[in-house]
From Swiss-Prot:
E.C. number(s) listed in UniProt: 6.3.4.4
Organism encoding this protein: Legionella pneumophila (strain Paris)
Active site location: D14, H42
Quaternary state and interactors: Homodimer.
CDD domains: AdSS
Keywords carried by this UniProt record: Cytoplasm, GTP-binding, Ligase, Magnesium, Metal-binding, Nucleotide-binding, Purine biosynthesis
Entry protein name: Adenylosuccinate synthetase
Amino acid sequence: MGKNVVVLGTQWGDEGKGKIVDLLTQDAQVVVRYQGGHNAGHTLKINGVKTVLRLIPSGMLRPNVTCYIANGVVLSPQALLSEIKELEGNGVNVRERLRISLACPLILPYHIALDKARETHMGKSAIGTTGRGIGPAYEDKVARRALRVGDLFHRDRFANKLTELLDYHNFVLTQYFKQPAVDLESLLDESLQWAEELRPMVCDVSACLHEHRKQGENILFEGAQGVYLDIDHGTYPYVTSSNTCVGSVINGAGFGPRYIDYVLGITKAYTTRVGGGPFPTELLDDVGKRIAERGQEFGAVTGRPRRCGWFDAVLLKRSIELNSISGLCVTKLDVLDGLEVLRIAVAYKDRDGNILSRPPLAADDFDDLLPVYEELPGWQESTADVTVMSDLPANARAYLKRIEEILGIPIDLLSTGPERDSTITLRGPFL
């Protein structure tokens, strides 16, 4: 009997999901992306070679794994084909093992133009999007006007829908944002090439997944971004445009909730965030700079520097509740090597001195909150590339044990470096 495992980020993304998904695919036959778009970069480092995947599931680097892009993903044909060719240039056989949902909404050039125009227009109030058209594409989906992958294979239907849709979006671009219009004819010509290249890879992903399930194969669902970027449960409005919580597997891949066996939450041993929005434990001092430098905290897709701070157990507790997380994987423990003191936020305090054990639901409500910290001693020894728990420094083990105690959940995996083998496995999700 196969097992179905979900891997998702418990913070603001960039937790190291790509490496862990790649590691776990040694026990999986299928890997599925079920939400987000090419705004998420999953970084893998195998035998010293770094690979950044944006749309294609991280299981693609395992030759016997079938990968799916499900209907919850907004798909840029241009970005996908570019990524396929990049991997093929490195000797990876992509097209025979990648399948794409006919129901994926398309990201087209006008979505990107709208995204960039809006961010420029908002100035200092900008959300800090990646400018890749993700939000506008999801807007079209919710407004029931999106073009989907399946439309590409019906030329007249696609042209009629695109003409009407482009008329609307070009009006907004030119009249409101004062930006150039997107050309219809060139987009139609480009779409012909997309259709030809994508046709062999499309399918009904939900139906395929249930066939894999019935055959007893292990399926791994790979989340993008993190819980606090969720459009409903994140630090709204500083969020992404999709649901990043575990429930997105159900809608975004057409996979029933009772079939999910295990949810693995990925968290860094500290906290990071990209772009604007609240960040209670953010460090603006030399410690924050040191963590950023040691952790090489720059966005895999955008290259933007990440904000760094202490581990926030208040946020993690809510992540665990929202996603019924079975166990945690703590990443980048080695980044904390050499620090004299470590801090864990165990609560927040408002301006009146009231102690809050849960994060607020709106971004503005974080403004007057300060973290309440618990201090623990650091360690001077290196934890890099350690693969046995007992070989970790005593204070590192104590730090991890305290996280388990505060959160009430086990740490099942521990990452001590970017390579596949730099991992401590305490309990495997597929066991």
